[in-house]
Structure formats: structure tokens, C-alpha cells
């Protein structure tokens, strides 16, 4: 089997990807048997290509799965931890923009009663 390109895999359905993954795994096991029995050098060099192809297929499957989960949870109140933005612990606990801008009744009253003074400069 020739080297598989990730862009070709992205258009395929999940069932097709799983079938291709199964085929690659079977091929890899055959190549490993050939390695033990003393197969040709061309087969031995093919092991690396097949392993990388398996990794590509699995990567595409995982990426599409995660993308679908992101779409599903978009706009929902709670998201799984692995879909939330990875920030530092302190940043996650920080007040959000709305909470930072909230003012107490006393503070609002004080600002209303004593607004900032505007001074005119005499030229």
C-alpha cells in the first residue's frame, strides 16, 4: 500500500476510515511475520510507512471526532474538560469581564452624587 495523505482521508466517512485502519493493521502484521521469517528488504522498509499510515488514519479519526464534539457543545453551559480552553489555573479562576465591571449599590450612589469635576483651562 502506498503512503496515505491526510487530506485524502479527511473526505472519507468514519466507516471507511475504520476499514482502512483494519486493512493497514493486517498488512503490518503480515510485514512483521515476513520480517521474522527473513523477508525481502523492500518489505522491511515498508513497515515504517505502514506504521505512519496507521498513525495518520487514527489522527484523522480523532480530529474529526473532537471537531464534532466541539460543534455539539457549542453554546452549551457546560463542556467536557478537554474541550475547554487550556489556561493557567489562576487565569481559569479569575473574574470574567462582566464580573469585573460590576459595582456595588454604594459605589453607584457615590459616583452619581459626586461625578468627576471638569475644569476649563483659561487661555
Swiss-Prot record:
GO terms for molecular function: mRNA binding; structural constituent of ribosome. Pfam families: Ribosomal_L29 (PF00831). One of its GO terms (biological process) is maturation of LSU-rRNA from tricistronic rRNA transcript (SSU-rRNA, 5.8S rRNA, LSU-rRNA). It is found in: Cytoplasm. The keyword Acetylation applies. InterPro entries: Ribosomal_uL29, Ribosomal_uL29_CS, Ribosomal_uL29_euk, Ribosomal_uL29_sf. The modification N6-acetyllysine is found at residues 19, 43. Its main location: cytoplasm. One of its GO terms (cellular component) is cytosolic large ribosomal subunit. There is a cross-link at residue 25 (Glycyl lysine isopeptide (Lys-Gly) (interchain with G-Cter in SUMO2)). Keywords: Acetylation, Cytoplasm, Isopeptide bond, Phosphoprotein, Ribonucleoprotein, Ribosomal protein, Ubl conjugation. The modification Phosphoserine is found at residue 29. SUPFAM superfamilies: Ribosomal protein L29 (L29p). Belongs to the universal ribosomal protein uL29 family. Component of the large ribosomal subunit. The ribosome is a large ribonucleoprotein complex responsible for the synthesis of proteins in the cell. Component of the large ribosomal subunit. NCBIfam families: L29. This is Large ribosomal subunit protein uL29. The lineage of its organism: Eukaryota, Metazoa, Chordata, Craniata, Vertebrata.
